[in-house]
Amino acid sequence: MSTVDFSQLPEPNLIQELDYESIFNERKEKFIALYPATEQNQWRTILTRESDPVVKVLQENAYLELLYRNKCNADARSLLLAYAEGSDLDHLALTEYGLIRLIVTPADNSVVPPSPAIYESDERLRERCLLSFDGMNTAGSANAYRYFALSADGRVDGIKVRSEQDSPYLLDVVITQVDSVNGQASEELVSIVQAALDPDHVRPICDRPTVKSSLATNYQIEAVLYV
């Protein structure tokens, strides 16, 4: 889950309104304004006829303008973290935050057909972009540990940072693994994340983070369905 709920943000002002009828009416008025005032009422009457060739040209012009505005909106959104997707988000993450999309599962060319690599989701990459600012400090904030844990390996999914009140410097960093059956992290992944959190430039000198896997609770539901 991202540290910011993008759905609560208002639509950016640079996103243009897409209203065909409004554009079409603007086109008609601009066309009429090209003629002397004595002829404008005549043209206004002519343009009420759907079959008139000039109306058809203005309709096409308005539709092309609608498509152009839609493309401008898409281009603008591709530059915003809240909206960018796919390769647009890759470029934004690299140029603005210095991050690249991590691999969850490497490609396997030994099978037929070859299995392509699986990369982290757009949502996860957005979260790392937001958390990257917390990663610039070594004050030991929970979000800083989240950032470094997520960046350690693309398989890291959920993260919970906790400490006891009487020993706040002893931290448990509990992780889940995205590609495991029950979410439990493997020993290999735990070791990778632990190595990422141990360096002095990552944690305060007094912090002792310990990475652990979450524990899965198996349960069975018995239900009676009435139809």
Predicted regions and their residues:
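Carbohydrate-recognition loop of C-type lectin domains
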Residues: 134-227
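N-terminal polar alpha-helical/low-complexity "assembly arms" that mediate subunit docking
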Residues: 1-139, 146
